[in-house]
Amino acid sequence: HRVDRRQRQMCIRDRVTDGAHPIYPTATGNLHHEVELVCAIGEDGDIIGWAVGCDLTRRDLQAAAKDKGRPWDAAKGFDQSAPCGALTLGALPDPAAAIALTVNGQTRQSGRLDDMVWSPVEVLEKARTLWDVQPGDLIFTGTPEGVGPLVPGDRVEAMVAGLSPLSFTVRPR
């Protein structure tokens, strides 16, 4: 499908560190995964490092909000909604680096960073127009095609070539 580059959905997230296992959230029957490159903001306000993240989305709540023209905050911003791997300090990974996600060993998402609609720098520039970006902030930068559902017990492996991978199991409520 075609993406309208004029519109961007941004939201505040609750991060889960690598090794932690998020609990399947309340108020949904349709939790989805979205592997993303995450940028970390340093003391000077610039990007100082990178990590692999997984944007967890209550897709049924998102669809209902879209239908009513409402924000997606309840669909995106919930406890443990943003598992994030270990931070790697330094320059942006190779723009042609692979980004992928598997669920129970089956590939669900596979792409390259240069296939993204917006570059990490563009995402950061837009975030700065909406919020006071602070040192320590983590900004998720978008996902390749192939997002899909998760259920309790699913084992998720997410990766961006050159970065520490992210692994977690969705725990039942």
Residue ranges and their predicted role:
Residues E34-D60:
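RNA pseudouridine synthases
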Residues R5, H32-E36, D46-I47, D79, ...:
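Short connector loops at helix/strand junctions that flank enzyme active sites
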Residues Q7, E34-E36, D55, N104, ...:
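Acidic active-site catalytic centers that drive phospho-/nucleotidyl reactions
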Residues R13-D14, Q80:
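Conserved double-stranded beta-helix
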Residues A51, R59-R173:
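Catalytic-pocket segment enriched in acidic/His residues
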Residues C11, E34, A161-L163:
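A short, compositionally biased micro-patch
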Residues V16-V35, K66-G69:
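Short acidic (Asp/Glu) patches
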Residues H1-I12:
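Single conserved hydrophobic/aromatic residue that forms the stacking wall/gate
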